[in-house]
């Protein structure tokens, strides 16, 4: 790995999707941290998150989509108004979110969490 910032930026911008998953990790709430023994987790659609920063700070809602190409997360009822009045989802960075409830419909994800090896 290079130390040069321009090469670091290029690497993150051109990273394949399976590597970009690491860029959409958010911290777990204290209760979940105790339960699973890990500090953060990859955010999936269906997880419930709390917005920590910005105009919508304190808002708690379900994740609608996780966009790996842009490494952004869209949360239910967190929108921004366009110039023509249309409401569109506001893209949020995972560092500004805290996961308060996990979507455990995926049995493989649940097994990884129990092992303490969530990717």
UniProtKB/Swiss-Prot annotation:
Membrane-spanning residues: none
GO CC terms: large ribosomal subunit
GO biological process: translation
Domain of life according to the entry: Archaea
A GO molecular-function descriptor: rRNA binding
Keywords: Ribonucleoprotein, Ribosomal protein, RNA-binding, rRNA-binding
Family that this chain belongs to: Belongs to the universal ribosomal protein uL24 family.
Function description: One of two assembly initiator proteins, it binds directly to the 5'-end of the 23S rRNA, where it nucleates assembly of the 50S subunit.
PANTHER family xref list: 60S RIBOSOMAL PROTEIN L26 FAMILY MEMBER
Assembly mode: Part of the 50S ribosomal subunit.
Protein name (database record): Large ribosomal subunit protein uL24
Organism name: Haloquadratum walsbyi (strain DSM 16790 / HBSQ001)
